[in-house]
Amino acid sequence: MMLKTVLRLPVCAALLALAAGCAMIPPEPVVTGPLTAPPPPPPQPSARPNGSIYQPSAYGNYPLFEDRRPRNVGDIVTIVLEEKTNAAKGVATNTSRDGSATLGVAAAPRFMDGIINDKLDTDISGGNTANGTGKSSANNTFTGTITTTVIGVLPNGNLQIAGEKQIAINRGSEYVRFSGVVDPRSITGSNTVSSTRVADARIEYRSKGVMDEVQTMGWLQRFFLIASPF
């Protein structure tokens, strides 16, 4: 009796570990990498500016006669999310096949009259018909705004941007993540750019909380769904 109890303990522990591992599998993130620019190095002491009208230290690294569009690491760009996709697919297949065969004996030896008689007059026919149809459609709309940070500048001048917005409501939280590459010439004077003009755009919208847990299938239900042969 003691031996059976000892043998059952590892089995129960393995089942509990398996259940804990399958309890909640977090989805893989779409946006990977840093979501903000690294902190800049501490400023070096410089000589006191003596200009009476224009002082470079008061305007950063921007020239006097150029706008303040983002061009350096750490600058801010506002992305206007205007994603809308529509996809539809339809398939129709019709096949048909007919066949026939006739077999008859016009003459046979006399000693086989009682055996054959009229049984060899055979007519065989067959047909095969198959019809199949399929249709699928998908619609996706995502609108909003998110402010990102320039995390890198490519050799050709394009900007690598990334950002995250988190919103906590009651006991749940939602976050939007965005990353991509944007041409500085696409940025408007109000420091905004449409998401449709961002290359390699990755948009992620996730939620955590009670509503997200309700939409997730339980681990035991997933186990029986995988093990079921039907």
From Swiss-Prot:
Compositional bias ranges of the Pro residues kind: 36-46
PANTHER family tied to this protein: FLAGELLAR L-RING PROTEIN
GO biological process: bacterial-type flagellum-dependent cell motility
Signal peptide: 1-21
Biological source species: Bordetella bronchiseptica (strain ATCC BAA-588 / NCTC 13252 / RB50) (Alcaligenes bronchisepticus)
Name assigned to this protein: Flagellar L-ring protein
Lipidation (S-diacylglycerol cysteine): 22
Record's bilayer topology term: Lipid-anchor
Residue span of region Disordered: 34-53
Primary localization: membrane
Function recorded in the entry: Assembles around the rod to form the L-ring and probably protects the motor/basal body from shearing forces during rotation.
Molecular function terms from GO: cytoskeletal motor activity
PROSITE patterns to which the protein is assigned, alphabetical: PROKAR_LIPOPROTEIN (PS51257)
NCBIfam families: PRK12700.1 (NF009340)
Keywords: Bacterial flagellum, Cell outer membrane, Lipoprotein, Membrane, Palmitate, Signal
InterPro entries, alphabetized: Flag_Lring
Family indicated by similarity: Belongs to the FlgH family.
